[in-house]
C-alpha cells in the first residue's frame, strides 16, 4: 500500500495524500473490511479470503485452490467480467474494490515434520486461510488463522506445526527458515493470490473524477509491479534458503496433491450452490479457467515444454 500512496501523491502533484498504517496499528489484522465498510477508514488493503464469513464469494477474488494463476486472475478480473462481479458483491457493504498486488504462485509452506503420505496430514496444525484451510480440515488437518506478525513465534514454539505465507522472497525476510526445516511445494492452495484495495463508496464518490482515475491507474501499476518484483526475486531467495541456510526443499507426494484437488473441487462446487451470487461468480471463474487452460495447451504450456528440452 505504501507504493500506491506514493504513486498517487506523485501523480496528483501532491493534491492527494494517503496515510498508510500497518496491520494492527489502528484496526485489528482481520478488521480491515469492517473498518472500510463502516467509514471509520476510507481505504484498506488486504486479501478477500479473510472475509469469507461475511462474503463467501470474495475468496474467488483472492485465490482458490487449483484456480487461476496471477496472469489468469488479472485477465479474468480486468477483461473477463470478474471486476464487475467483484464490485457487485462488495457494493452492499459500501465498498469499492480495486486489484492491488499479486505475488504469484505461492509455496505450500514451512513444516516441522515431513509429509510423506496423507497420514502425515492428519492432525497437522497449519496456518492456512481461505478455502485452502477447509481442504486441509477435510483431509484431517487442523487449519489455524493467524495474522502474519504472529507466525514466526507460533511456528517456533510449536503452537502450529506448519504455516503457509507467500514465497521465498517474502519468507526469507520473515526468517521462517530459523523455525522450520522443510519447505514444501507446490502452492496448490494459492496459485495467484490477488490483494485488494478497499475504498469506502461514500469516500470514493466524494472524489473528483481525475483523482479516481489516478487511484485506479496507480493501483493497477502497483498490481503488476508487485508481480514483476516477486518473479524477479523468488528464485534468488530460494537459492539462498537452500544453499546458505540448509533448508530442505520438498515436493508434496502426488497422492496428497490429488486428494487435495478432489476435495477442493467438491468444496468449490458445493459453495457455488449456496446462493445465486456465489453461483454466478463460480460459473464465471470456472468458465474462464477452462477456456484459458485450453489455450495454454498450445501456447505457454507447449512453449515451456519446448524451451526446457
Question: What feature does the model see in each segment?
Answer:
Residues 76:
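General nucleic-acid-binding
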Amino acid at each position: 500500500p505504501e507504493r500506491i500512496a506514493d504513486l498517487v501523491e506523485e501523480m496528483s502533484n501532491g493534491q492527494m495524500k494517503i496515510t498508510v498504517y500497518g496491520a494492527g496499528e489502528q484496526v485489528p489484522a482481520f478488521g480491515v473490511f469492517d473498518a472500510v465498510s463502516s467509514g471509520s477508514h476510507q481505504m484498506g488493503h488486504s486479501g478477500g479470503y479473510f472475509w469469507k464469513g461475511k462474503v463467501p464469494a470474495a475468496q474467488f477474488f483472492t485465490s482458490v485452490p487449483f484456480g487461476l494463476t496471477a496472469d489468469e486472475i488479472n485477465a479474468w478480473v480486468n477483461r473477463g467480467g470478474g471486476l464487475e462481479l467483484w464490485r457487485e458483491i462488495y457494493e452492499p457493504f459500501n465498498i469499492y474494490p480495486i486489484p492491488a498486488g499479486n505475488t504469484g504462485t505461492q509455496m505450500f509452506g514451512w513444516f516441522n515434520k515431513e509429509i510423506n503420505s496423507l497420514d502425515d496430514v492428519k492432525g497437522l496444525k497449519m496456518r492456512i486461510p481461505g478455502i485452502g484451510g477447509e481442504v486441509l480440515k477435510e483431509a484431517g488437518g487442523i487449519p489455524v488463522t493467524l495474522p502474519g506478525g504472529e507466525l514466526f513465534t507460533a511456528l517456533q514454539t510449536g503452537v502450529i506445526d506448519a504455516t503457509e505465507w507467500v514465497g521465498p522472497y517474502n519468507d526469507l525476510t520473515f526468517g521462517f527458515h530459523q523455525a522450520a526445516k522443510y519447505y514444501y511445494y507446490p502452492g496448490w492452495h494459492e496459485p495467484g493470490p490477488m490483494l485488494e484495495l478497499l475504498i469506502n463508496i461514500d469516500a470514493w464518490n466524494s472524489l473528483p473524477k481525475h483523482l479516481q482515475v489516478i487511484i485506479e491507474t496507480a493501483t493497477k501499476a502497483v498490481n503488476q509491479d508487485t508481480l514483476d518484483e516477486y518473479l524477479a526475486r523468488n528464485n534468488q531467495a530460494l537459492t539462498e534458503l537452500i544453499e546458505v541456510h540448509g533448508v530442505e526443499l520438498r515436493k508434496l507426494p502426488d497422492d496428497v496433491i490429488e486428494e487435495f484437488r478432489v476435495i477442493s473441487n467438491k468444496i468449490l462446487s458445493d459453495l457455488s450452490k449456496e446462493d445465486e451470487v456465489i453461483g454466478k461468480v463460480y460459473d464465471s471463474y470456472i468458465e474462464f479457467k477452462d477456456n484459458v487452460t485450453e489455450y495454454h495447451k498450445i501456447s505457454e504450456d507447449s512453449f515451456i515444454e519446448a524451451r526446457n528440452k
